[in-house]
């Protein structure tokens, strides 16, 4: 009975130590690629930095002439040309490709189904919200009410009626039903 756990422990340690001591060539290949990339980048930066003026004598000599290759410029055709050693390299960032679209067409926020449902429910609530009343009560909108903006935002027709309904009418002239309704509303 004790032999089975001991054998399993022995096989597990053998597998663990055997895998740990085995050399993988993946790390060596990665190191080679990394060194090659770092070396080419260092050469490129050295070449570019030597083309820029570094001292006062270089600035007095005149501006350095920079060459822009057609394949470096975004949107141009990719024609193979000989590379010029002192050419300025224009790099186009990857995210600029997505920024070319018109900003107004792109919606911000998440694009999950739940967010879409929430946005739709919010729009439906805004369009069908009957509880809100965008108009203040008549007693507040009247010229005796508060706020210059409210008095200014009155429609001209209702402003004329309001002024006419408050003016004393001649006792002999019968009032129209609309004027009577407005007069009772103002009294309330």
UniProtKB/Swiss-Prot annotation:
Alphabetically ordered keywords of this record: Amidation, Cleavage on pair of basic residues, Disulfide bond, Hormone, Secreted, Signal
InterPro entries: Adrenomedullin-reg_peptide, Calcitonin/adrenomedullin, Pro-ADM
Site (Required for CALCRL receptor interaction): 116, 125
Annotated region (Disordered), positions in chain: 131-177
Sites of Tyrosine amide modification: 146
Cystine bridges: 110-115
Gene Ontology CC annotations of this record: cytoplasm; extracellular space
Modified residues (Arginine amide): 41
UniProt propeptide residues: 45-92, 153-188
GO biological process assignments: adenylate cyclase-activating G protein-coupled receptor signaling pathway; adrenomedullin receptor signaling pathway; branching involved in labyrinthine layer morphogenesis; cell population proliferation; developmental growth; G protein-coupled receptor internalization; heart development; negative regulation of vascular permeability
Residues annotated as signal peptide: 1-21
Gene Ontology MF term list: adrenomedullin receptor binding; hormone activity
UniProt-annotated location(s): Secreted
Pfam families given in the database record: Calc_CGRP_IAPP
Function: Numerous actions have been reported most related to the physiologic control of fluid and electrolyte homeostasis.
Stated family: Belongs to the adrenomedullin family.
PANTHER family, A to Z: ADRENOMEDULLIN, ADM, PRO-ADRENOMEDULLIN
Name of the protein in question: Pro-adrenomedullin
Lineage start: Eukaryota, Metazoa, Chordata, Craniata, Vertebrata
Encoding gene, per UniProt annotation: ADM
């Amino acid at each position: 009975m004790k032999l089975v756990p001991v054998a399993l422990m022995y096989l597990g340690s053998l597998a663990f130590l055997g895998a740990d001591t085995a050399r993988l060539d993946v790390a060596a290949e990665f190191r080679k690629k990394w060194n090659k990339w770092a070396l080419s980048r260092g050469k490129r930066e050295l070449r570019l930095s030597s083309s820029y003026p570094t001292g006062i004598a270089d600035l007095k000599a005149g501006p350095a002439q920079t060459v822009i290759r057609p394949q470096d410029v975004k949107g141009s055709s990719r024609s193979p040309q000989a590379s010029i050693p002192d050419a300025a390299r224009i790099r186009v960032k990857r995210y600029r490709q997505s920024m070319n679209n018109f900003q107004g067409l792109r919606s911000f926020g998440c694009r999950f189904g739940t967010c879409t449902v929430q946005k739709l429910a919010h729009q439906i609530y805004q369009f069908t919200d009957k509880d809100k009343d965008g108009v203040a009560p008549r007693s507040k909108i009247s010229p005796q009410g508060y706020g210059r903006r409210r008095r200014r935002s009155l429609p001209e027709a209702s402003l004329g009626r309001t002024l006419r309904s408050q003016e004393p009418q001649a006792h002999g002239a019968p009032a129209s039903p609309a004027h009577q309704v407005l007069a009772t509303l103002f009294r309330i």
